[in-house]
Amino acid sequence: MKKEEILIKFNNADEEEKRNILLSLLLDLDKKDDKINEQKSNIDHLNELINYYKNLIFGKKSEKNKVNPNQLSLFNELETEETISELEQKIEEIKGYKRRPKGSKNLVNEDNNLPVEIIEHRRDDLSCPTCGNELKEIGYDVRKELCVIPEKCFIKEHRYFKYACPTCSKMVQEEREVIPFPNSMYSPSLVGKFIYDKFALSLPFYRQEQSYRDLGINISRNNIINYVSKACDLIRPLYDKYSEIIKSADIVHGDETRLKVLSEKNEEGNVKTNYVWLFRTSQSFNKQITFYYYNDGRKYSNVTSFFKNETEEARYIHADGYEAYEHIKGYKLVSCFAHARRKFVEALNVMPSSPSKKRQICNEYINLIGKLYKFEKQYKEDKISYEKRKERRLIEEKPILDEFFSNLKRDSLKVLPESKLGKAIIYSLTREESLRRYLEDGRLEIDNNMAEHLAKNYAVGRKNWLFCDNPNGAVKSCMMYTIVHTAIANNLKPEDYIIWLLDNIATTNVSDIESLAPWSSLIPDEIKRK
């Protein structure tokens, strides 16, 4: 009904009808207000999505929180003052004036005994330019530069001498040693270089082929792949040993990353996305292992069938929000506070920059998590025992966790569940038990960053080759990533370790395979990082 018609009807109505008309108009207004609020919420949600995808494509990847200085008085003054006081403590006081600590000027570690080539620069003319008398040498200034010798190859020729008895004509020849790649010119150092370049430096095989061609050596990509595959066959017993050990560890970190295998198709005939799983022993475990494991898809069974805890003791697995980790028999899930924080950072990044209640709420959660991390950093700096860390966490961090989850329950009723902030709140609230679980044992970590970073190593390499041709190639790439990154986890020089491993593995019994692991007493000192 139009305004004019309503006015005419209202003017001609008696008192009872006027009240009914007004009541009807008020009900219509309420409905329109509800509709406007609903549309406004939808617009806010769509704007959040737009800002989220803009930030995803064009924004910075850092999760550092940029706080609006105009909002500091609301919730962040204490944190700011503490940060300033920390910075002030780092300023050195030297003889009446202050200066910031300088960064190290040493390009080379002092204990790195690099060879030094001395080049002396002397004057040819030793006559004084002022009086003409002969100059006397009184010392010298030094300029140092770090130089690199371009990679060189050489051929090592083994000669096995033959002997004959002049009396009885008996022929004798020196026995040949057992080598990993018989009847070929491919040495452990060459194959070790293939492996190191691909699985530590993420250098694709076709680029390795090009680099050898530049040195005048005709090594095809297919030959590189063939010999890396042969190395995998030799190394498999050690890989299986790592698998056995990591399944026995009482604390494990886990993560996963995508991998396309060309020969694996889905029902529509498209290349199926499979997953590489990454498992890492905890820092407290006596054998540091980084284990990559390929299996078809992201099904729960890929994780639940790998880990089987048949003992009575409690075991823990650090992981992100993927539900499969919750279903591993005999393992308790320890959720990741870095993931929880990331959800609030994402919510903050899609909000308008002007001060608002939502920004305040979001920053409060980020600051509370920041307080937890501040304590964790202090524990590491103090180098306290795991038992002491558990005690201090219960005293210092538990009250912060109580406040964090209490606020989540309060704010969950105030924000839209489908908004970024709503999703961040729900993410942490539904994982309260597993987010608190790190308080149970001082060996547990507040987050799963260690496994995440290792999964990213595989993802970085994947960008250079995108996919594997077949499942066997995916399995072997996981084997090599495991060998390389387990060496790194044990503070070994990965290339030197791989060469040493290939040199010795052909003469080692499978029953003694752990003697070649990075924690073995047989590891030479020269392949250990200083």
Predicted regions and their residues:
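Catalytic center-proximal scaffold of phosphoryl-transfer enzymes
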Residues: 1-3, 23, 125, 162-164, ...
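Short, flexible loop/hinge motifs at secondary-structure junctions
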Residues: 1-182, 224-225, 253-254, 260, ...
